[in-house]
C-alpha cells in the first residue's frame, strides 16, 4: 500500500514538473495573422484588440500576433484561417471581390464620408445579410479605410491627366480607376512601395494614412483629392478555434465586435489627418483639390460601376438593389 502511495505521489510530482506553464495556468494561446507591416492601421488595431482581450479575460487568453505577412499573406488570409494555419486573421475583402460580393458593396461609390461611418455601415451590412462567404469563419470585427485619393509621382489635375496612367488599385478602387481612364494595376499594398520604386506604377488610389505608414510621400509628391471608394476589411477566426473557447471568453470577443470596429474607424480618421499634415511638412506634397464642377464630372464617370455590380450580383441570385439600398441607409444612419 505504501509503495502504491509513493508511486502515485511520484507520478503527480513529475506531471507538475514537466507540465508547461501555459497548461498549468490554463492559458489559451491564439495566433493572429496580418499582412501589412506593423505600423499600419490593420496591425495597430490588431495590437489594440490583443491587449483588450488579454486584459478583459484576466490573462486567460494570450494572443501571439504576426504582422507583415510572416504567417499568412493578404490573398491567403481567409483560406489560411479556415484551414487552421492561424487562429485569427485580418485582410481586405477587396482582394477577392467575386468571393465577398455582399460586403464589397461597401466599396462601391456610395458616398462613405469617413472610416468610422464606413466601418459601422459595413458591420451593419454583414449582420443583416450574413453572407455565405463567412459561414465557415467567425467574424470578430469589420472596418473600412477612409475614402480613397490619388497619390502619384506626376500631377493629376484633370481626367485628361489620368488617362492611361498605371495606378495601383484593387477591388472597387480598380473599377474606379478604370472608369476614370487610368490603367489599374492590382497588387497587395505591401508590394506597392517596390512597384513605385521600379516604375511599375506611377501612383495608387487608396486612403491617405499610407502616405506616412508606407512612406509613399517620399515618391508620390502629388495627391488628387477625389474622396471616393474605400477598402473593406474583416477580422475572422477559425471556427474550430472559436468553438473551443470557453463561453466567458467568447462573450469578451463578442462584446468587442462593434467597439473594435468603431475604434478602428476613428483611429483611421485621426491618423489620416496626421498623415496629411506630415506629408505636407516633411515632403512638401501638393494636395490638388477638384472644384465642384470637376468633382461632379469625375463622379459622373462612376455611375456604371454600381449598375454593373447590381447586374452581376442579381445574376448570382442576390437581392442586389436591396443590398445597395441597405448600404446607403447604414451610411446615413452612422453619419
Sequence positions of predicted segments:
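Absolute protein N-terminus
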Residues: 1, 25-26
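P-loop NTP-binding core
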Residues: 122
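N-terminal secretory/targeting leader peptides
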Residues: 26-117, 125, 129-335
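Bacterial N-terminal signal peptides that target proteins for export
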Residues: 1-10
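C-terminal segment of classical bacterial N-terminal signal peptides
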Residues: 15-23
Amino acid at each position: 500500500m505504501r509503495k502504491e502511495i509513493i508511486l502515485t505521489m511520484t507520478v503527480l510530482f513529475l506531471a507538475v514538473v514537466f507540465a508547461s506553464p501555459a497548461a498549468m495556468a490554463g492559458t489559451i494561446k491564439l495566433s493572429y495573422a496580418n499582412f501589412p507591416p506593423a505600423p499600419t492601421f490593420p496591425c495597430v488595431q490588431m495590437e489594440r484588440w490583443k491587449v483588450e482581450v488579454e486584459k478583459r479575460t484576466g490573462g486567460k487568453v494570450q494572443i501571439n500576433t504576426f504582422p507583415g505577412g510572416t504567417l499568412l499573406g493578404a490573398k491567403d488570409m481567409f483560406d489560411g484561417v479556415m484551414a487552421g494555419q492561424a487562429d485569427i486573421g485580418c485582410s481586405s475583402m477587396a482582394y477577392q471581390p467575386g468571393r465577398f460580393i455582399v460586403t464589397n458593396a461597401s466599396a462601391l461609390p456610395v458616398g462613405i464620408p469617413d472610416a468610422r461611418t464606413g466601418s459601422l455601415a459595413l458591420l451593419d451590412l454583414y449582420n443583416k445579410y450574413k453572407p455565405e462567404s463567412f459561414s465557415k469563419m467567425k467574424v470578430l470585427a469589420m472596418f473600412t479605410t477612409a475614402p480613397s485619393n490619388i497619390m502619384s509621382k506626376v500631377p493629376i489635375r484633370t481626367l485628361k491627366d489620368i488617362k492611361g496612367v498605371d495606378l495601383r488599385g484593387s477591388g472597387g478602387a480598380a473599377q474606379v480607376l478604370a472608369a476614370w481612364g487610368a490603367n489599374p494595376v492590382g497588387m497587395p499594398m505591401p508590394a506597392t512601395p517596390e512597384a513605385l520604386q521600379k516604375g511599375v506604377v506611377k501612383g495608387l488610389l487608396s486612403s491617405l494614412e499610407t502616405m506616412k505608414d508606407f512612406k509613399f510621400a517620399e515618391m508620390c509628391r502629388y495627391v488628387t483629392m477625389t474622396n471616393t471608394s474605400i477598402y473593406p476589411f474583416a477580422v475572422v477566426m477559425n471556427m474550430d478555434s472559436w468553438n473551443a473557447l470557453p463561453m466567458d471568453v467568447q462573450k469578451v470577443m463578442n462584446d468587442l465586435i462593434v467597439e473594435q470596429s468603431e475604434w478602428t474607424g476613428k483611429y483611421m480618421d485621426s491618423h489620416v489627418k496626421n498623415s496629411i499634415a506630415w506629408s505636407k511638412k516633411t515632403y512638401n506634397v501638393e494636395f490638388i483639390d477638384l472644384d465642384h464642377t470637376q468633382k461632379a464630372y469625375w463622379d459622373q464617370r462612376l455611375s456604371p460601376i454600381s449598375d454593373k455590380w447590381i447586374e452581376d450580383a442579381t445574376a448570382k441570385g442576390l437581392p442586389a438593389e436591396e443590398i445597395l439600398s441597405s448600404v446607403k441607409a447604414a451610411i446615413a444612419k452612422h453619419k
